[in-house]
Amino acid sequence: MATALITGATAGIGAAYAKLLAKEGFDLVLVARDLPRLKGVAKELSKLYKIKAETIKADLTKPAQLAKVEKRLANNSKPIEVLINNAGFGLKDSFLVSNLAKEQELLDVLVTAPMRLSHAVLPGMIKRNSGSIVNVSSVASFIAGGTYSAAKSYLTVFSEYLHTELRDTNIKVSALCPGFTRTEFHARGKMKMSGLPNYMWTAVDQVVAKSWRYVKAGKVICIPGWQYMLLSSIARIAPRPVVRKLGIKIRRKQR
């Protein structure tokens, strides 16, 4: 069986991707900070889908712990066929008053970790001429919304670059750019979401299913939901002052 490694695998998009891939017969390497919860997910999926599930407890802001995941990805005796760079978090406060250490941790998780993990897994994929990488970005990557948007913009552009660089191979790279998705993400970030209209929410299973279809089809940018396809299209063609105002308006509503 092929093996998939998923970061941030205990909840939200990561957990949904783990379930989808297990259902398709992939063995799993699940990565997260919460080991008891991680083992619970691994046990549940192993039992339900008759697959093997490894766990790696790792805080991706810590270089030594990130290195453990890199080492597993580089182990070609147990190759990783699919890498899902999903781990992440958001910050509620404006950059002007936020904790600088938290801002740095956000960059460590959203930028440094996916870059290093992709670099670790790609040599094996290139040697086998097979593999897929999904970088979980955001529609926030198309607007101006602080460090989070900037980091997600990196992921989107990085994915586009790798997709193009590897176009003559059988390796697929895709950026998943969801909008507001019903997960623990916003509650954990203590963001105010009560005023968001119901039609702006997307279901996590549908988000992941569309992403995986796009990966299989070799498509580089996946934006689930008609509302976010429209929003991203507007963001790409609108004058930048309009995009900047939209970004700051959305951010301020979450505080």
Locate the predicted segments by residue.
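The beta1-alpha1 cofactor-binding region of Rossmann-like NAD(H)/NADP(H)-dependent oxidoreductases
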Residues: 35-36, 57-68, 100
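Substrate-binding pocket helix/loop in short-chain dehydrogenase/reductase
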Residues: 94-107
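SDR active-site lid
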Residues: 163-230
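Active-site helix of classical SDR
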Residues: 118, 151-154
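Conserved glycine-rich Rossmann-like NAD(P)H-binding loop of the short-chain dehydrogenase/reductase
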Residues: 24-40
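Residue(s) in the substrate-gating loop at a strand-loop-helix junction
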Residues: 138
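Conserved glycine-rich cofactor-binding loop
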Residues: 10-11
